[in-house]
Amino acid sequence: MNSVTVSHAPYTITYHDDWEPVMSQLVEFYNEVASWLLRDETSPIPDKFFIQLKQPLRNKRVCVCGIDPYPKDGTGVPFESPNFTKKSIKEIASSISRLTGVIDYKGYNLNIIDGVIPWNYYLSCKLGETKSHAIYWDKISKLLLQHITKHVSVLYCLGKTDFSNIRAKLESPVTTIVGYHPAARDRQFEKDRSFEIINVLLELDNKAPINWAQGFIY
């Protein structure tokens, strides 16, 4: 692991070597906007903004991307809910349960699945207000997601409206699926078969499929 310093909380960002090419720009961009971001109480707390940068990228095949953290109790790990109360991760788990037949589980975490990096496009929000920090994170968000897409085969974005123009923001050619948000009305996410489709796309790219059942916590 490496680390760099920034002028505001969290003051130190610890990161895996695979993120090295974007770190100097990240530091520059963060120092420009941090004082604005940190006027608010945030979800997650600043010490957890960059926690996913500890993840390697060279072993990832799929990025599962949400728009921003939970407005309360964000952990810095996208979709993670230690007490398994958040609707998004419960819907994701339910979808994987139908796909895999696993039913006796107590939780689900995308971050423990081989080959998968869960990501949030914006790395924080004002406590209680989704997308409230979008304007501050925009340059950083684009920089980091572009870097991720240089490593993965499939980018799966959750939210048809939020990600309607995501392809225009990416420089690397990456297979992109824009699906329904897990909290979408009329149970649209339930009918969405993106997790299956991802594995078909990986096989077409001669990559190993994802074992989605690995995310279950018992």
Swiss-Prot record:
Keywords: DNA damage, DNA repair, DNA-binding, Hydrolase. Gene3D superfamilies: Uracil-DNA glycosylase-like domain. The active site is at D68 (proton acceptor). The keyword Hydrolase applies. InterPro entries: Ura-DNA_Glyclase_AS (IPR018085), Uracil-DNA_glycosylase-like_sf (IPR036895). It is an enzyme of class 3 (hydrolase). It catalyses: Hydrolyzes single-stranded DNA or mismatched double-stranded DNA and polynucleotides, releasing free uracil. One of its GO terms (molecular function) is DNA binding. Its EC number is 3.2.2.27. Transmembrane segments: none annotated. The keyword DNA repair applies. One of its GO terms (biological process) is DNA repair. Homodimer. Interacts with protein OPG148. Component of the Uracil-DNA glycosylase(UDG)-OPG148-polymerase complex; OPG148 and UDG form a heterodimeric processivity factor that associates with OPG71 to form the processive polymerase holoenzyme. Belongs to the uracil-DNA glycosylase (UDG) superfamily. UNG family. Plays an essential role in viral replication as a component of the DNA polymerase processivity factor. Excises uracil residues from the DNA which can arise as a result of misincorporation of dUMP residues by DNA polymerase or due to deamination of cytosine. This is Uracil-DNA glycosylase. It comes from Vaccinia virus (strain Ankara) (VACV).
